[in-house]
């Protein structure tokens, strides 16, 4: 991926209008970008593609989590609106563009992982992780880059989200491998892999998982128990832990209870703990923990 110090200004959505398309590039100094109607902590470093029939518009951004000094590089669409415009242009009207943003809940969870000072977040060093409903993969990348995870599998039902997560892992210095190669001996950085994964359907994974991570996964009471069963199956061999970050105020009442009840029925002990906010503008976040240890 290009790492040229280019920058663009992405105008915010105003008066219901969608954002303008990105120019191909501008050789100017880095500047703040506006994403999805609010200011982001992301700095656009390069325009990678303006979009075509195969790939949406993509930019490379850098961001810092909490007090960490080292930046994380990510590859992503410039905004949810920009991705939706591309979906419209390519005739994919049933697609969900929400994966194009690093949402506040994921930012808070990733910050807690990166800073490593929250005792309610399990020790991820040398652990084999899977991020469920990963989207852009910010939580998993923070675990790999900042917490010393052995490996991370990004799982999502959207192939383009996995493409971006693995591209981000690569530009952030991770080793990108196939799921079947995660168990191979290697040195250096964490290994990252990706897989299409729909928790509403029974599936097996060709890798052992110690910890399942997720953010903003509990939005449908009808599938909350299915997610719990999926997570329980993923950590069954290792008697591992599941950690799902969610807004303190539920978006759909009953999701959290359904998830916790299903985890308890599967033999887990559960708890809910608060997470520090990534910034003052972010809403309160909680961590839903289920442990089979």
Model-derived segments and spans:
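S-adenosylmethionine-dependent methyltransferases
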Residues: 2-293
């Amino acid at each position: 991926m290009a790492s040229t110090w280019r920058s663009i200004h992405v105008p915010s959505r105003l008066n219901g209008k969608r954002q303008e398309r990105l120019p191909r590039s501008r050789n100017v100094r880095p500047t703040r970008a506006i994403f999805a109607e609010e200011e982001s902590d992301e700095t656009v470093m390069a325009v990678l593609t303006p979009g075509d029939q195969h790939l949406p518009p993509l930019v490379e951004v850098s961001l810092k989590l909490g007090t960490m000094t080292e930046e994380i590089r990510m590859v992503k669409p410039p905004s949810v609106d920009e991705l939706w415009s591309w979906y419209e242009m390519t005739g994919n009207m049933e697609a969900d563009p929400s994966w194009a943003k690093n949402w506040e809940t994921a930012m808070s969870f990733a910050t807690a992982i990166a800073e490593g000072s929250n005792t309610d977040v399990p020790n991820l060093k040398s652990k084999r992780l899977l991020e469920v409903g990963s989207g852009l993969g910010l939580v998993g990348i923070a675990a790999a880059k900042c917490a010393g995870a052995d490996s991370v599998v990004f799982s999502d039902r959207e192939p383009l989200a996995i493409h971006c997560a693995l591209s981000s892992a690569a530009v952030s210095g991770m080793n990108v491998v196939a799921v079947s190669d995660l168990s191979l001996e290697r040195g250096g950085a964490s290994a990252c892999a990706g897989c299409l994964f729909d928790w509403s359907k029974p599936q097996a994974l060709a890798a052992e998982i110690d910890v399942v991570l997720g953010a903003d996964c509990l939005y449908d009471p009808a599938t909350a128990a299915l997610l719990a069963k999926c997570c329980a199956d993923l950590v069954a061999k290792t008697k591992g832990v599941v950690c799902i970050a969610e807004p303190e105020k539920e978006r759909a009442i009953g999701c959290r209870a359904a998830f916790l009840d299903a985890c308890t029925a599967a033999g887990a002990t559960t708890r809910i703990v608060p997470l520090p906010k990534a910034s003052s503008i972010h809403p309160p976040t909680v961590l839903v923990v289920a442990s089979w240890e």
